[in-house]
């Protein structure tokens, strides 16, 4: 959350002549409501199943840069599918940089707007070990310009 997955993915896809696919955007488009509304109306488990369905559509996909929501790794089936599809890059961000990026955004369903830092710390504590275990590469995006991050990723994927 707040690591720049979507914005970096779009730029990277353009620079590498690959197509870009944002799983969250596909879900929003298909459901006709934003992620916060989906969480509120149907719950997190429903949303995680939507992520799984979107990944299942990508079984034989090539030449794509794919951005996922940060919680996609909470289902083992999603991890297995992502590993089958291609490389998993973890855009890691330190808590201070993350807080700066998301503190004024009120549409994050897993963030308590009255206690943003505690919410982020809890998510990070739970998710980061999973990412560290499953990813092929970790890219620290804390306090870096997008062009620097993209060059780091290009060295890996090209």
Model-derived segments and spans:
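NTP-dependent small-molecule kinase module
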Residues: 11, 15, 61, 125-158
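ATP-binding Walker
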Residues: 3
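Conserved substrate/cofactor phosphate-moiety recognition/catalytic segment
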Residues: 14-53
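A glycine- and Lys/Arg-enriched "phosphate-lid" helix/loop adjacent to the NTP-binding pocket
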Residues: 85-128
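Glycine-rich phosphate-binding loop used to anchor ATP phosphates in small-molecule kinases
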Residues: 46-87, 142
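Walker A/P-loop
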Residues: 6
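Hydrophobic/aromatic beta-strand patches that form the interior of the parallel beta-sheet core
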Residues: 21, 87-89, 137-139
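Short, structured coil segments at secondary-structure junctions
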Residues: 16, 84-85, 106, 134-135
């Amino acid at each position: 959350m707040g690591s720049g997955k979507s914005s970096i993915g779009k730029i990277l896809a353009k620079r590498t002549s690959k197509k870009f696919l944002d799983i969250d955007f596909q879900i929003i488009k298909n459901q006709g409501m934003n992620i916060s509304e989906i969480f509120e109306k149907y719950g997190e488990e429903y949303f995680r199943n939507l992520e799984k369905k979107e990944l299942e559509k990508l079984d034989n996909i090539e030449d794509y840069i794919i951005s996922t929501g940060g919680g996609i790794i909470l289902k083992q089936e999603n991890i297995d599918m992502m590993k089958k599809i291609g490389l998993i890059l973890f855009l890691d961000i330190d808590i201070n940089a993350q807080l700066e990026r998301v503190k004024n955004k009120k549409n994050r369903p897993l963030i308590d707007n009255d206690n943003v830092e505690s919410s982020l710390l809890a998510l990070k504590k739970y998710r980061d070990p999973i990412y560290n275990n499953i990813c092929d590469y970790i890219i620290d995006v804390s306090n870096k310009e997008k062009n620097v991050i993209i060059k780091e990723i290009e060295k890996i994927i090209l």
